[in-house]
Amino acid sequence: DHTALSPRDELVLTDQQMPGSPLGIPSGATGPIQPNYWRAVEYSAQHMAPSPAGANNFRCQPRAGQNPVVLIPGTATNAYSSWSMMSEELTRRGYCTYTFNLNGVPHSSFISLTGDMRESAKGLGAFITMVLTRTHTDKVDLVGWSQGAGPLPNQYLKFENGASRVDHFIGLVPSNHGTTAYGLNLFLNSTTSKLGAHFDDSMALLNGMSAPQQLQGSDFNKTLYDTPVTQPGVKYTIITSTHDHVVVPYTN
């Protein structure tokens, strides 16, 4: 529904939309609930832009005391592979859920959120505006994982005036402060090595800047986290695991 978007927001979403996901909304058939992440990845690679069960029903009206829930995928994942189970569960419990595919690998329908996270934050903001307008609500709750639990929503909240539109932000194993990648950050970080500058250039060609941005010590992380990141008025819940082998150390 383009009428729910300002020309600016429509331009942002159109610029970042992926095959099968106009304005970020997966247009494929609803996929089955998957018992684990890798089966969901396989299914999304074999089917064009499947939608997780229950998601993106813009006729859904939140119950009293509830906000629409925007589910944010992780790096190089997609709406379905990230949320095939949780979207259905939240919908079954009466929540209105929304999720998206944006700013991914060129020409891919299922590898999203690989691009510059500063741009993805603008896309997230435009998507949230669309949700608020079409559900006639003032605020959303955010639930995300990995990039979608840390740097992306934090960039939106801190630099895109997102705090005025978010009530509760729940982050699952977020990549806050980046990852050392078991020491590779020392070689791949453009702020510390010439090799890192070449890595940035290579990732930019693939619309993959979210990878170097999520290295510990990156310019992106310094800008986002070197000053207070939490925003007044937003409730934060962070859930992490000592068994996380991607975001290392897990305390990041």
Model features per residue range: what roles?
Residues 1-89:
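Flexible, membrane-associating and regulatory peripheral segments of lipid-active enzymes
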Residues 61-65, 90-92, 134-135, 143, ...:
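Extracellular/periplasmic catalytic domains that process cell-envelope and extracellular macromolecules
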Residues 73, 120-224:
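Serine-dependent carboxylesterase/thioesterase catalytic core
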Residues 76, 104-106, 176:
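Alpha/beta-hydrolase active-site loop signature
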Residues 88-108:
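Conserved alpha/beta-hydrolase
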Residues 107-123:
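Catalytic nucleophile-loop/oxyanion-hole region of alpha/beta-hydrolase
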Residues 229-252:
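C-terminal catalytic-base region of ester-bond hydrolases, centering on the histidine
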